[in-house]
Amino acid sequence: MGSLHDYVLIITGSASGIGLATATIALDEGARVLGVDISSPPRSLIDHSNFKFVEGNLSLEPTPRRVVEACVKAFGGRIDGLLNIAGVMDLNQSVDSLSDTMWESCIAINLTAPVKLMREVIPIMRQQKSGSIVNVASKAALSGAVSGVAYTASKHGLVGATKNVAWRFKQENIRCNAVCPGAVDGTSIHRGLETSQFDSEALGTMSLIHEAHMRDRERGIHIQPEDIARSLLFLVSSRSNGINGAIIPIDNAWSTI
């Protein structure tokens, strides 16, 4: 019997990258999973009897509520965990080159959607007097020298929301934590972005930091989606009771600089 046997989990971004790895491992460990993504998941998930899926854009107003309603309909009234993994990157734009579209997209997907999903699951978790929320932030949540202003602001905001939710509901056995990945192999956070449009001047100011971190990869030190997934599932499980309001880097010490 897996360590997540009969857990009911909502996992966003479940069609690829960290979200796919998290959903796959959770199912292997006995969880029941409601996956969410703007793209269709692979057949390996669709064919699993304990996996249900909502295809939708989390930035649209009805989607967070529709996701939670679908989970309740599929698995009953209990929701043990919410894993906010879905995210989008920016074009590394500084505040002086930032477009309204990029700002609104990053804030909508990376901050507003996770907050609205937390708003939808908290009443259920309060009623059952338990629950665990894990948000995927970023190294950019801990630094101003990783990405553009939109992505950086959205992930800093998610860390603030995580801490507030953790403190507010700690007496009701509801936990809320965040992880901050660095560079992760096999992720699709740049999906839909044209890299030729990146703010090259802003990227240049960060080049030394990025080059230092990339040397690890040249030496064969890679962080895989499964590495992040296992940390997320540890935090959502009872094995991490007592860990609440934590912001945990998973970046092979990148966060130390």
Swiss-Prot record:
Organism classification: Eukaryota, Fungi, Dikarya, Ascomycota, Pezizomycotina
Reaction equations catalysed: asnovolin H + A = chermesin D + AH2
Gene3D superfamilies recorded: NAD(P)-binding Rossmann-like Domain
UniProt-annotated glycosylation sites, renumbered to this chain: 57, 92, 110
GO process annotations (BP): novofumigatonin biosynthetic process
Residue stretches spanning the membrane: 7-26
Record-given protein name: Asnovolin H dehydrogenase nvfC
InterPro entries in the record: NAD(P)-bd_dom_sf, SDR_fam, SDR_superfamily_enzyme
Pathway: Secondary metabolite biosynthesis; terpenoid biosynthesis
EC number assigned by the record: 1.1.99.-
